Amino acid sequence: APRKCDIAAMNLIRNAAVYARLVKVEHTLFALPFALSALCLADICGAAFGLREILLCVAAFTAARSAAMGFNRIADREFDAKNPRTKNRPSATGEISPRAMSAFTAASAAAFVACAYFINTACFILSFPALAVLFGYSYAKRFTAAAHYFLGLALSLAPAGAWIAASGSLDPRILALSGALFFGIA
């Protein structure tokens, strides 16, 4: 018979896989290079940062995206259940309860803000409007045909945020990468 610790480990792995499907972790891995590219550009331009900032940027990016995806799944749960393309999402099937999604989203948002706090003051202050933009997309798509501009803006924050994490300020040189990402999505 399986031991309790074996069952607990299997449940933990199963739950992690469900949450990874909820936030489409593969898309997080696809989008992360935009933030990492900004760190490389900041390094080339002379910003002084180290492994600590790199790891905090990766953690902040992952937490912010998880919060945004969790919020979007909560907002769209009823729509997703009726849509053939999205009806099998864990949020639509009930595999994850709305309460659990809310807790996950809140924890992810808190982790993002905490990472931003430990990076620098500018990142911490900007983490709140960044979350507003990330969460705003979930409702913008219901009220405007320009929702892709909202999504483009949300995604373009990653390189700008990484630059600010590396240098402590926003520099016009990073706006080219953020702008390309914005217009590439929008």
Residue map of PLM features:
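The first (N-terminal) embedded transmembrane alpha-helix
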Residues: K24-A42, G152
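Residue-level micro-sites within transmembrane alpha helices that shape
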Residues: V23-E26, R52, A64, N72, ...
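Hydrophobic cores of alpha-helical transmembrane segments in multi-pass inner/ER membrane proteins
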Residues: F34, P159-A162, F183-A186
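Membrane-embedded alpha-helical segments that form the functional core of polytopic membrane enzymes
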Residues: S37, L41-A75, R85, A109-Y117, ...
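Intramembrane alpha-helical segments
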Residues: L12, A17-R21, R89-I174
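Short, positively charged and aromatic/hydrophobic N-terminal segments
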Residues: D6-I7
